C-alpha cells in the first residue's frame, strides 16, 4: 500500500489537541478544585511542549530542514500552526480560569490581589513582605553598567519602569526576580490567597529606594530545555551529563508570557533583550505561572470541592502475612494500578533486600521520586552485601538531577550502577530477584508499563506483572547482561525488546490478523501512535476487514474514518488518573495479550531499550480483557477521533460508564467481599471471578 502525506495527522497538532482535552475537563461537572488541577496540568504540559517540541522546531527551521514529519509539514508551517492554535486557545483558558475562580468565590475561597484586601489583611501582607519576601527577592537594575541578567527557565519576575524621584525625566528599567523558594500565593487567611507579585508590586518603591514606580508587569520566560549529549565521546557520562544540565539553563528563549495591557516600553525592553519572536509572546488577562495552582487545589480545608479520595487496594493472592515470593511462585499475578495498590511492587524489593536467601537484585530505574523507599531498599540490600545491579537512566528528561543523586547514593552503598547504553535511552520497567534455595537458584520477575515511583503510581493507570516462569527468568537475565556488558545480540526469545524486535513482533501480529480478514480483531491501548510503518500496516488490515479499536490517550497520527481506515476506531480517555498503560490484544496470535513499556513511536521502537511482555496466565488475560472492555465502553471520559484530527465527546447512553470510577468500585467491592475471608486459595479464586463477572 502506498501512503501519502494526507493520510497522516500532524504529530504536534495531535499533541495540542490532547492538551485541549485536558483543558476541556474544566467544562465538565467536576468539583471546582479538580478543575483547577486540570488548568495546572494543562499549563505544565504546555511548558514542556514549548521547552522541547517548539524549541526543536525552531532549531530545525534555523538549520534549513524542509520536512520533519510524516505529513510533510515543514518546521515553519508547524510553528505557524502551533502559534495560531495556542493564541486562540489562550482565550478559552482565560474564560475557564475566570469562571472557576468566580465559582470558588461563591464557596468562600478567594484569589485576591493586594489592593482588594481590607486594611487588616493588607497589614498582614506588609508584615509577610518584610519578614519573608524582602530578604530573598533580587532587585535588578538594567543599564550600561548592569547588563540584562540571566533568567532561569520558567522563572517568574516583575519587570519595572521607574524614575528618579529627584529627576523624574530619568526613566530606568529593571526587574524583581521572585525566587522559587517563595510560594506562588501568600495564604493571608484560611480562605484567601494573595498572588505574590501583587505584594511585590505594592512594595516596589521600597525595593528601589529613591525611585518612583511608573509601571510594572509580571512576566515568565521559557527556554529551550532539550539537551544534546555526545555520548560516543564521553569517557565519564555522569560528568558530561552534569555539564549538559548547566548548559541547559542557558538555552535560547522560546516564549515570553506577560500580563495583558503591560506598559509598551516594558514589553519593548524585554523583547529587545530576549529577542523573542513576537508571535511567541503571549499576553494574559489572568494570572501567570498557573502550574502553581496546585498550592490552592491541594487545600484540604475545602474537601467538598475535591473528588472523594480513593485508596488503592491490595487483593489476593497478595497478603500481608504471606511472602511475596511464595505468592509469585504459585502463580503469575497481574495488577492494575492505581485501582490496585502499588504496595506489592515495593514489598517485592523490600522483602528481597531483607531476605537472607536473596543473592541478587536487578532493576531498571527511569523516573524515581525524590524520597524513594524502593531505592532505599536497594541501598540497604547493597549495604548488606547483596549483589545489586541498577540501571539508572540518567537521560530521563527533567529527572536527570534526581537520577544523578540516586545513582551516586547507590554506588556509595556498593551497588553496581549502569548509566545506560550509548545512543539509547533505557525505558524498560523490569526487576529481577534471585534467591538461592539449597543448591538451586529461584528467579522472580516484575515487569511493568509504569515507573518504580510510588507517587506517580497513585495517579497513573499502569499494569504490573509478577512471574517466576523460567522463560521470563532466561530473558530478563539476558536483558540485564545486555545492559551491563557488551552484546551484539539484542534479541530475546519470549519477551520482545526494542530497538527493532518489538516493532517486528507488532507488525507480524498485525499481518496475522490481516490474513484472517473479517475474522481479525486488534485492540491496542497506548499513550501515542506515531510510527508510520505500523500505521500503514493498520490501514492495510482495515482494508481487509480487520476490526481495530485503538485507545490512545495522547498523540495519534493515524486518520480514522477514511476509505482505507473505515474499520478503525480511535478513542482517547482523559480522567483524574493519567492513562499510562500499554496493553495490546491480537485475536489470532498465541499468546494474544501483551503489556509493554513502549508506545508505537519511532523513539520507543528504534531509539530506546523497551520490553514487551506476553501474558500467558488465564486469570491475568481475563483481567486485561475486562480492562479493555471497560475502556471501550466508557462514555464519560472518552473522546472520539475524527478524520480531520479533531476530537468529539462520545455521547452518553442510558447506562453511564466512567471506566476509572467503575474500576474503583469493582476493586472496592472485591476488597470488601474478601476482607474477612481467611481461605487464601478461595479468596484468590473469588477475586478473579468477581473481576471477570463485573
Curated annotation (Swiss-Prot):
Highest taxon above the source species: Bacteria
A GO molecular function held by the record: polyphosphate kinase activity
Keywords: ATP-binding, Kinase, Magnesium, Metal-binding, Nucleotide-binding, Phosphoprotein, Transferase
A Pfam family assignment: PP_kinase_C_1
Catalytic activity: [phosphate](n) + ATP = [phosphate](n+1) + ADP
Active site: 427
Keyword Metal-binding set for record: yes
Disulfide bonds: none
Binding sites annotated in the UniProt record for ATP: 45, 460, 553, 580
Post-translational modification: An intermediate of this reaction is the autophosphorylated ppk in which a phosphate is covalently linked to a histidine residue through a N-P bond.
GO terms of biological process kind: polyphosphate biosynthetic process
Positions contributing to Mg(2+) binding: 367, 397
Family from the record: Belongs to the polyphosphate kinase 1 (PPK1) family.
Role, per record: Catalyzes the reversible transfer of the terminal phosphate of ATP to form a long-chain polyphosphate (polyP).
Stated name of the protein: Polyphosphate kinase
Organism (species): Campylobacter jejuni (strain RM1221)
Amino acid at each position: 500500500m502506498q501512503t501519502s502525506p494526507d493520510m497522516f495527522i500532524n504529530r504536534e497538532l495531535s499533541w495540542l489537541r490532547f492538551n485541549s482535552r485536558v483543558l476541556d475537563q474544566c467544562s465538565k461537572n467536576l468539583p471546582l478544585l479538580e478543575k483547577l488541577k486540570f488548568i495546572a496540568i494543562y499549563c505544565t504540559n504546555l511548558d514542556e511542549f514549548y521547552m522541547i517540541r517548539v524549541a526543536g522546531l525552531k532549531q530545525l527551521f534555523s538549520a534549513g530542514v524542509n520536512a520533519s514529519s510524516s505529513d510533510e509539514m515543514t518546521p515553519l508551517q508547524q510553528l505557524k500552526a502551533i502559534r495560531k492554535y495556542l493564541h486562540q486557545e489562550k482565550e478559552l483558558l482565560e474564560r475557564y480560569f475566570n469562571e472557576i475562580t468566580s465559582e470558588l468565590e461563591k464557596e468562600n475561597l478567594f484569589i485576591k490581589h493586594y489592593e482588594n484586601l481590607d486594611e487588616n489583611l493588607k497589614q498582614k501582607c506588609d508584615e509577610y513582605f518584610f519578614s519573608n519576601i524582602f530578604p530573598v527577592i533580587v532587585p535588578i537594575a538594567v543599564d550600561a553598567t548592569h547588563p540584562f541578567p540571566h533568567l532561569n527557565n520558567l522563572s517568574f519576575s516583575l519587570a519595572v519602569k521607574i524614575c528618579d524621584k529627584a529627576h523624574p525625566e530619568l526613566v530606568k528599567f529593571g526587574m524583581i526576580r521572585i525566587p522559587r523558594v517563595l510560594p506562588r500565593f501568600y495564604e493571608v487567611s484560611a480562605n484567601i490567597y494573595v498572588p505574590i507579585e501583587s505584594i511585590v508590586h505594592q512594595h516596589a518603591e521600597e525595593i528601589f529606594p529613591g525611585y518612583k514606580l511608573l509601571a510594572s508587569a509580571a512576566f515568565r520566560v521559557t527556554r529551550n530545555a532539550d539537551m544534546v549529549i555526545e555520548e560516543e565521546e564521553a569517557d565519564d557520562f555522569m560528568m558530561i551529563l552534569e555539564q549538559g544540565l548547566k548548559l541547559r539553563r542557558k538555552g535560547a528563549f522560546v516564549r515570553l508570557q506577560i500580563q495583558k495591557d503591560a506598559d509598551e516600553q516594558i514589553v519593548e525592553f524585554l523583547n529587545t533583550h530576549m529577542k523573542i519572536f513576537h508571535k511567541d509572546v503571549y499576553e494574559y488577562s489572568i494570572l501567570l505561572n498557573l502550574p502553581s495552582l496546585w498550592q490552592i487545589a491541594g487545600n484540604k480545608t475545602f474537601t467538598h470541592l475535591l473528588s472523594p479520595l480513593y485508596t488503592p487496594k491490595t487483593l489476593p493472592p497478595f497478603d500481608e502475612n504471606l511472602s511475596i515470593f511464595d505468592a509469585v511462585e504459585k502463580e503469575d499475578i497481574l495488577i492494575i494500578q492505581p485501582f490496585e495498590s502499588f504496595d506489592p511492587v515495593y514489598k517485592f524489593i523490600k522483602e528481597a533486600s531483607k531476605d537472607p536467601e536473596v543473592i541478587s537484585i536487578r532493576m531498571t530505574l527511569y523516573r524515581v521520586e525524590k524520597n524513594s523507599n524502593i531505592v532505599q531498599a536497594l541501598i540497604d540490600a547493597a549495604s548488606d552485601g547483596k549483589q545489586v545491579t541498577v540501571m539508572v537512566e540518567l537521560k530521563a528528561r527533567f529527572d536527570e538531577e534526581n537520577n544523578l543523586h540516586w545513582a551516586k547514593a547507590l554506588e556509595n552503598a556498593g551497588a553496581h550502577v549502569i548509566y545506560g547504553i550509548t545512543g539509547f535511552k533505557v525505558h524498560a520497567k523490569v526487576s529481577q530477584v534471585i534467591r538461592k534455595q539449597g543448591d538451586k537458584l529461584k528467579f522472580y520477575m516484575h515487569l511493568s508499563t509504569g515507573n518504580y515511583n510510588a507517587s506517580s503510581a497513585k495517579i497513573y493507570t499502569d499494569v504490573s506483572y509478577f512471574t517466576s516462569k523460567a522463560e521470563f527468568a532466561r530473558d530478563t537475565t539476558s536483558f540485564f547482561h545486555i545492559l551491563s556488558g557488551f552484546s551484539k545480540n539484542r534479541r530475546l526469545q519470549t519477551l520482545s525488546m526494542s530497538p527493532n524486535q518489538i516493532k517486528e513482533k507488532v507488525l507480524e501480529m498485525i499481518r496475522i490478523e490481516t490474513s484472517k480478514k473479517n475474522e481479525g480483531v486488534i485492540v491496542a491501548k497506548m499513550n501515542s501512535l506515531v510510527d508510520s510503518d505500523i500505521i500503514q500496516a493498520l490501514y492495510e488490515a482495515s482494508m481487509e476487514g480487520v476490526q481495530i479499536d485503538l485507545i490512545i490517550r495522547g498523540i495519534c497520527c493515524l486518520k480514522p474514518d477514511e476509505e482505507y481506515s473505515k474499520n478503525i476506531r480511535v478513542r482517547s480517555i482523559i480522567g483524574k488518573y493519567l492513562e499510562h498503560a500499554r496493553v495490546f490484544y491480537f485475536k489470532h496470535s498465541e499468546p494474544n495479550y501483551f503489556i509493554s513499556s513502549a508506545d508505537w513511536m519511532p523513539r520507543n521502537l528504534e531509539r530506546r531499550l523497551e520490553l514487551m511482555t506476553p501474558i500467558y496466565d488465564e486469570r491475568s488475560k481475563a483481567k486485561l480483557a475486562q480492562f479493555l472492555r471497560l475502556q471501550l465502553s466508557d462514555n464519560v471520559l472518552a473522546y472520539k477521533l475524527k478524520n480531520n484530527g479533531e476530537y468529539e465527546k462520545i455521547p452518553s447512553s442510558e447506562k453511564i460508564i466512567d471506566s476509572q470510577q467503575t474500576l474503583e468500585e469493582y476493586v472496592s467491592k472485591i476488597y470488601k467481599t474478601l476482607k474477612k475471608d481467611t481461605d487464601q486459595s478461595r479468596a484468590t479464586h473469588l477475586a478473579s471471578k468477581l473481576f471477570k463477572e463485573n
